[in-house]
C-alpha cells in the first residue's frame, strides 16, 4: 500500500537509534530521505548514588512502540520494510540466563560509576604495573602495537570490563550461571537481537564489541588475555559479525511481518558512517548526552597515551575501518541538569540567554558529573561552578555551561591533533546539542576550523540505515 501522505510505494529501511536520552526510529527511502518517524524519551533509572540503569522490559516496550509508530507515521505496512538497522549506545550491558532468557539485572549504563573503586584499585595495582612492564618489553622486542597498547592500558568506569567484574563479584546468580556455561552477556544491540529473534540469535558486531574494552581490536576477537586477567569467562560473550550483515528475521508476532535485521552498529560509529567520514583524517564531533570526537585512521589502529580509544568503526566484508576516539560524558547531561534547576524554561532559550551577557562574568563550569575523561582521565572529578559572585545571573550560569561544552570540545580536538599526527581533512558535527549555534560557533572559533553540520542531525540513525541498506541496495554511492 502507498502512503496517502507521501505516495511511497517502494520498500523502506527502518533505523532505530537507542541513545542515552532518547530512543528514535526513522524510516528512510533509497535516497536517504525520512518518510516516517517516532521517538520516546529513554527511561533511565538512578537507584542510588553513582548507579545508572535501564529496565530491560521498559526498553523493549519502548523499542517495539517507536517502530510501530514510525511505520504508522509513514503510512505504510510493515511488509513494505526491506530491513532494519539498529544503532545503540555503547558499553551499556546486561546478562541473562541462556536457557530461560531471564535477565539477572537491569542494563548497567556506560555512565554508571559503581565500579569506580575497582577501577582505582586496578589502576594502582602491582599486577597491572607488572603487565605494563612485561608488555613494554614485548613491544621493544617485537614492535607490535598491541603490546604497546597493553603497556599503556588503564581502566575507566566507561569500559564494560570492570563493571562486568563488579557484576560477577556482587550478583551470585551471574557468577554461578557463568561457571555452568549458562550465562549470556550482551550490549543493547545483542539483547535486542535476542528479543527480536525470540532467543534464536546471539550475536553482536565489531563496532559494538570494540567499544566494550573486552575486545582485542588488534586480533579482532574477544581478549582471552584480559578475560584471564580479570577472571571473566569467555563463554559468556556473543559471536562477532560484520556490521552490515543478515542477522536474522524479527519474529512476525512482534511487528506483524518478518522484518530482516541487516545491521547492528554502535552509535558513534553509526554517526561516523552517516556523516560519510570515509577518508583518513575525517573527523566527526557528536554532541548529545556526551561529546564524542572520532577520527578515521583507516586500516591502522591508533595506540594512545592520553586516553583516546582505538575502535573498529565498521567491518563490511573485507573492509575494516578503524577510528580513534575521545569523549566527554556530560555535555547534554549538564544542560539537562540546568533545565531541572529551572535556570531556563526551554533548551531553545539557552542560546539567547548566553548572548544576552557580554561574557561569562568570570564563571566557569567543570562539566564532570561522571568524572573527566580524555585527556584528564579522572573518574573522581566532580562538577563545579567557579567564580560565583553576588552579581552572577542565570544568564551567566547558562553561558558558562554552554562554554564548558566548547572548552571540552577544544580539549578533545587538541588531544586528537597531538596524538594521531594525521592531517585533518574535514570536521562534521551532529547530535542534538549541535543545534545550539552558540556552542557551534565557539567550538569553531576555538578550533580555528570550519565545522560542517547537516540539517538532519540524527546521524546515528542514518548510519544504521545506510549499513542496513547496503544489504538491500548494494554498496553506498558517495559521489
From Swiss-Prot:
GO terms for biological process: glycerol catabolic process; glycerol metabolic process; glycerol-3-phosphate biosynthetic process; triglyceride metabolic process. InterPro entries: ATPase_NBD, Carb_kinase_FGGY, Carb_kinase_FGGY_CS, FGGY_C, FGGY_N, GK5. Its EC number is 2.7.1.30. Skin-specific kinase that plays a key role in glycerol metabolism, catalyzing its phosphorylation to produce sn-glycerol 3-phosphate. Involved in skin-specific regulation of sterol regulatory element-binding protein (SREBP) processing and lipid biosynthesis. It is found in: Cytoplasm. SUPFAM superfamilies: Actin-like ATPase domain. GO terms for molecular function: ATP binding; glycerol kinase activity. Keywords: ATP-binding, Cytoplasm, Glycerol metabolism, Kinase, Nucleotide-binding, Transferase. The gene is gk5. ATP binds at residues 20-21, 289, 332, 432. Belongs to the FGGY kinase family. This is Glycerol kinase 5. Its main location: cytoplasm. It comes from Xenopus laevis. Pathway: Polyol metabolism; glycerol degradation via glycerol kinase pathway; sn-glycerol 3-phosphate from glycerol: step 1/1. It comes from the Eukaryota. Glycerol binds at residues 90, 267-268. One of its GO terms (cellular component) is mitochondrion. PANTHER family: GLYCEROL KINASE 5-RELATED (PTHR10196:SF68), SUGAR KINASE (PTHR10196). The keyword ATP-binding applies. Pfam families: FGGY_C (PF02782), FGGY_N (PF00370). It catalyses: glycerol + ATP = sn-glycerol 3-phosphate + ADP + H(+).
